[in-house]
Every structure is written in structure tokens, then in C-alpha cells.
Amino acid sequence: MVKKSMAFIMSLLIVLCTTPFVNANTGTEFDDSKSDVSCEWIQDDELLVKDGTDLSRIKIDENMVTVTNLKTETEEYFYISEGKVHSSITGETVNVLERDSSEITNSDSTIKKAYKSKTRTTKITYAKIKKLAGGSAGLATIAASIVALLGAAGFLCPGATPQVLSLISGIAGFASTVMKGSSKHGIKTTLKSYKRNVKGDIMECWKVTKIVKY
């Protein structure tokens, strides 16, 4: 069931990223003057992120989140497969299902009856994020790794990258805290589900509403 769910979720990512929902997000997503972080959609599936003097492009494909540093012209990726995320940055793989199987959603089927929105919370340790993002990552790479981990956990979150960036940029010293790599502390992410029409099927998707440290 888990393998079926993961395959279904990954196969929908491109479809979801090229529907009017994301097209409507074209333009500035947020501009946080306090943290000097801003981002905007430059194509249906590509996001431009400015973090201080760093400029990055995040691209979401069917089962991959790619981060390109436009200053150094280096490209890295997070590959999602069967509840796992592999990082080209570190060469490491994080198994989301190893301890978080209770967080797997049931998004492997369309919604056939009256729908009631749900709220879920999931925890991600700093150790997992650092294992994927590396020891000197900026907010763009950290956000991309979080989005990949949520996808591997079964949360279908179209357009989640700006939400994640906005929330983590508001946490003082977040990147430095992540780089410490604690396995006992991390982030608690709250997601709220909603229904969405995808080519005639009503699907359950998720919006990231809150990220706090624990």
C-alpha cells in the first residue's frame, strides 16, 4: 500500500505543478524584509529564491527537487522514491518510513464522498535535514529538503516551497540551528488538507500552515 501511495503521489507532481493553482502564484510569493529572503515563480515548476546575496532556483519534477545555485552554477537534487529521499549533495539517503510510518497519508485514491478537511502534524529532526542538505546549506536548500521529506512521507503539497521558505525564514538563526544536526530536536510541521480538482478527479492535497521548533 505504501509503495502504491508513493508512486501515485510522485506521478501527480508535474500535473499539479502545471495547473492554474500554481499559475496563479506567478509573481512574488513573499518578501521577508527582516530575514532578507524573497522568492517568486519564474515558470510553472520553477521558483527563484533570493537569500541575502545568494540566488537559487528550485525546480520540482515528477520525483525530484532540484536546487541550482545561480552564482556558482552548481546543481544538486533530492530524489524521492518509496518513502526515501536521496541527496546528491551528501550522497546520503533518509528513510522517512523508518520511524514515521504513522504519518503516511491515504492520498492514494481520489475523494468520492463528502470531504472534511484534516489537520496533521509531522516531526522532522535537524539530523535528517542536515543529512540531506549538508553542513553549510542556505535556506533555499534547506527548504527544498523539507519539501522532499514531506513528499516522501505521503503529503501531496503543490506549491509548498514558498510556504516552507516563508515559515522557516521567520525562525531566528534557523539555518545555524539545522547545521548542528541534532537528532533529538527539529521542526514540527502542521499541514491542513483540502480538496482539489485535478483533471476531473477530486484529490486530497495539503498546505503547510505552521512550522515550529521542538
Question: What spans do the regions from the language model cover?
Answer:
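Sec-dependent N-terminal signal peptides of Gram-positive bacterial secreted proteins and lipoproteins
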Residues: 2-25
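Alpha-helical hydrophobic membrane-insertion segments
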Residues: 5, 22, 133-136, 168-171, ...
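Residues within alpha-helical transmembrane segments of multi-pass membrane proteins, especially transporters
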Residues: 13, 153-156
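N-terminal propeptides/leader regions of secreted preproproteins
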Residues: 21-128
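Active-site-proximal helix/loop microenvironment
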Residues: 159, 175-178
